[in-house]
Design a protein with these regions (language model features):
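Hydrophobic, ordered structural segments
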Residues: 57-64, 82-139, 159
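Short Fe-S-cluster ligation motifs
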Residues: 98-115, 199-218
Length: 254
């Protein structure tokens, strides 16, 4: 991954010498896709991300050693409609912001007495995609007041800070150069309403955390570890930034 990301980073540095006008209203990455990629996402029979949703359905019903399952506590997956729109969110018990992946793993350890699913594992991506898929079409609506406000401020600061050998911030691409061309593709706003996504470059499913790490690698910066406090707070900021955009998971991206 690093070789490809470094090559991309060099191209980014060249492209960002151009002048561009920022877009302020939230626009889904779907609007920047090629027609054939849009068609792939729109067709549930062809959308490869649905394979992870199906895996999530199997895991939802699977009993742990203590006899519990996601379904025994929560009912059918459809009962999760609306849940994904609110994550990441403040957790009183954890004393911090918790992502949906972390909530799933807390249920694993506390309710099912099972080990956590590793980040970026098919199992965790599958369950996350299943829960998010139930909210498809509903607007993202994370809490932005109270303790969440402080976390969002830290995420925003990270988003706007230049870093890495290329000295670029997230805003360098996803605010200042939205609509510009990079390696034959159009730079989007970097909205996260489609996550977890099936990314064609990865030939697999990926979380917001994985995407953040990949972008950091592309600008030759130290990647944030998935599940770290900063990564989760950055995701919260990103979801607040896209407030109102409809959930698309599992989206397909380049």
């Amino acid at each position: 991954m690093r070789a490809g990301a470094c090559l991309l980073g060099a191209v980014i540095a060249g492209c960002l010498s151009q002048t561009s006008v920022a877009q302020e209203a939230p626009v889904s990455g779907y609007e920047f896709l090629l027609p054939e990629t849009k068609a792939l996402q729109d067709d549930d029979f062809a959308n490869p991300g649905m394979l992870w949703v199906e895996l999530g359905e199997e895991l939802w019903q699977k009993q742990a050693a203590n006899g519990t399952s996601c379904q025994s506590c929560h009912g059918t997956p459809e009962a999760m409609r609306g849940v994904g729109t609110r994550y990441p969110q403040w957790s009183e018990t954890q004393g911090g912001i918790v992502s949906l992946e972390q909530q799933i793993n807390m249920c694993r350890t506390e309710r099912q007495q099972e080990p956590v699913f590793p980040y970026s594992s098919d199992e965790l991506n599958g369950l996350t995609a299943l829960v998010m898929h139930q909210s498809r079409g509903l607007p993202m609506s994370v809490a932005t007041s109270g303790p969440a406000a402080e976390a969002i401020a830290r995420g925003k600061d990270y988003y706007e800070t230049r870093r890495g050998q290329l000295n670029l911030a997230c805003t360098s691409c996803h605010v200042q150069h939205v609509g510009d061309r990079l390696r034959g593709e159009t730079i989007s706003q970097g909205q996260v309403n489609g996550f977890p996504i099936y990314r064609q470059l990865w030939q697999g499913m990926g979380s917001v955390g994985r995407m953040i790490a990949w972008c950091n690698d592309a600008v030759r910066a130290e990647p944030l570890a998935e599940g770290s406090q900063m990564a989760v707070e950055l995701e919260l900021y990103l979801r607040s930034r896209g407030e109102g955009l409809p959930i698309e998971s599992p989206a397909v991206r380049r």
